[in-house]
Amino acid sequence: MALTKIELAESLVEKCGFDKRIAKLFVEQFFEEIRSSLEKGEEVKLSGFGNFSLREKNARPGRNPKTGETVAVTARRVVVFKPGQKLRDRVENVKVKA
């Protein structure tokens, strides 16, 4: 099961007493700030959670798995997330559902 933005907003309503509309706006604005910072090329550091940054990937040859045909994979920019030590410690012994 995945945690959704709606569930995050509902948690703010239940645990913090936020109005439902305000909680939804809060969650939306939180993620918009992350997106906006990354669009500007800035790193996003969330203490105790982790860092989001951009990484450039070079063009490279690839292979179509269905046909085996060689194709060119273009250069691109990707978002990477590096979890912080506190997050790594909390999830270290969590069993992953297959």
Curated annotation (Swiss-Prot):
Coiled coil: none annotated. PROSITE patterns: HISTONE_LIKE (PS00045). It comes from the Bacteria. One of its GO terms (molecular function) is structural constituent of chromatin. CDD domains: IHF_A (cd13835). Disulfide bonds: none annotated. Gene3D superfamilies: IHF-like DNA-binding proteins (4.10.520.10). Keywords: DNA recombination, DNA-binding, Transcription, Transcription regulation, Translation regulation. InterPro entries: Hist_DNA-bd (IPR000119), Histone-like_DNA-bd_CS (IPR020816), IHF-like_DNA-bd_dom_sf (IPR010992), IHF_alpha (IPR005684). One of its GO terms (cellular component) is cytosol. This protein is one of the two subunits of integration host factor, a specific DNA-binding protein that functions in genetic recombination as well as in transcriptional and translational control. Belongs to the bacterial histone-like protein family. This is Integration host factor subunit alpha. It comes from Actinobacillus pleuropneumoniae serotype 5b (strain L20).
